[in-house]
Swiss-Prot record:
<feature type="binding site">
    <location>
        <position position="38"/>
    </location>
    <ligand>
        <name>Mg(2+) 1</name>
    </ligand>
</feature>
<feature type="binding site">
    <location>
        <begin position="37"/>
        <end position="38"/>
    </location>
    <ligand>
        <name>D-ribulose 5-phosphate</name>
    </ligand>
</feature>
<dbReference type="InterPro" id="IPR000422">
    <property type="entry name" value="DHBP_synthase_RibB"/>
</dbReference>
<protein>
    <recommendedName>
        <fullName>3,4-dihydroxy-2-butanone 4-phosphate synthase</fullName>
        <ecNumber>4.1.99.12</ecNumber>
    </recommendedName>
</protein>
<dbReference type="GO" id="GO:0030145">
    <property type="term" value="F:manganese ion binding"/>
</dbReference>
<feature type="binding site">
    <location>
        <begin position="150"/>
        <end position="154"/>
    </location>
    <ligand>
        <name>D-ribulose 5-phosphate</name>
    </ligand>
</feature>
<comment type="pathway">
    <text>Cofactor biosynthesis; riboflavin biosynthesis; 2-hydroxy-3-oxobutyl phosphate from D-ribulose 5-phosphate: step 1/1.</text>
</comment>
<dbReference type="InterPro" id="IPR017945">
    <property type="entry name" value="DHBP_synth_RibB-like_a/b_dom"/>
</dbReference>
<dbReference type="GO" id="GO:0005829">
    <property type="term" value="C:cytosol"/>
</dbReference>
<comment type="similarity">
    <text>Belongs to the DHBP synthase family.</text>
</comment>
<feature type="binding site">
    <location>
        <position position="174"/>
    </location>
    <ligand>
        <name>D-ribulose 5-phosphate</name>
    </ligand>
</feature>
<feature type="site" description="Essential for catalytic activity">
    <location>
        <position position="136"/>
    </location>
</feature>
<feature type="binding site">
    <location>
        <position position="38"/>
    </location>
    <ligand>
        <name>Mg(2+) 2</name>
    </ligand>
</feature>
<dbReference type="GO" id="GO:0009231">
    <property type="term" value="P:riboflavin biosynthetic process"/>
</dbReference>
<keyword id="KW-0460">Magnesium</keyword>
<comment type="subunit">
    <text>Homodimer.</text>
</comment>
<feature type="binding site">
    <location>
        <position position="42"/>
    </location>
    <ligand>
        <name>D-ribulose 5-phosphate</name>
    </ligand>
</feature>
Length: 213
């Protein structure tokens, strides 16, 4: 991680605190990982406050693969099986089967329909029969222990939601450049400044958790 580029947003502690303030106000944040890992930045929003305009931003400015990060407990409660039995992807990203709300959507692919699906899934009383499969929202199962166990965007998202006082469920999508390539740290920072978003790294969350928990 090129730490020097992030110092304009403060030190690790300050960056996490700014991100938590944004999230508490229902705004998004940009979470980056190490350049020796995926070297990507994910745009993240709290699941329980996601809006249609925010979903439009995720679809237009990011990869379009909108993911719902959930705890293992929530995944089991919703009856979501893993997408594959043998996960052979490089970072073992834990995709479950995709979901759609059973009611309140049309084809499920519009921004409004995806918001409906997410808000349905994160309700405390949501049951497996309230969802259908496959769908246009892709749940991810976070590992217990968060970023201290796996330094991934999924765990970082769930950790941030907990720290911000939300239920541990968040939305993420990978930021892309206008030409379709993946945004790297310089482009991520420019996007953050343009849209007044906080930027932090997974390493920042690791340091914050070690200090505060």
């Amino acid at each position: 991680m090129n730490e020097s580029l992030l110092t304009q947003f403060g030190n690790s502690l300050t960056r996490v605190e700014k991100a938590l303030e944004n999230l508490k106000n229902g705004k998004g944040v940009l979470l980056v990982d190490d350049e020796n890992r995926e070297n990507e930045g994910d745009l993240i929003f709290p699941a329980e406050t996601i809006t249609v305009p925010q979903m439009v931003m995720l679809i237009r400015e990011c990869s379009g693969i909108v993911c719902l990060c959930l705890t293992d407990k929530k995944v089991k409660k919703l009856g979501l099986t893993q997408m594959v039995h043998n996960n052979t992807c490089t970072y073992e990203t834990a995709f479950t089967i995709s979901i759609e709300a059973k009611e309140g959507v049309t084809t499920g692919v519009s921004a409004a329909d995806r918001v409906t699906t997410i808000l349905t899934a994160v309700k405390d009383d949501c049951k497996p029969e309230d969802l259908c499969h496959p769908g246009h929202v892709f749940p991810l199962r976070a590992r217990a222990g968060g970023v201290l166990t796996r330094p991934g965007h999924t765990e970082g998202t769930v950790d941030l939601m907990r720290l911000a006082g939300y239920n541990p469920a968040g939305i993420l999508c990978e930021l892309t450049n206008p030409d379709g390539t993946m945004a790297r740290l310089p482009q991520i920072i420019n996007f953050a400044k343009k849209h007044n978003l906080a930027v932090l790294s997974i390493e920042d969350i690791i340091k914050y958790k070690k200090i505060t928990t």
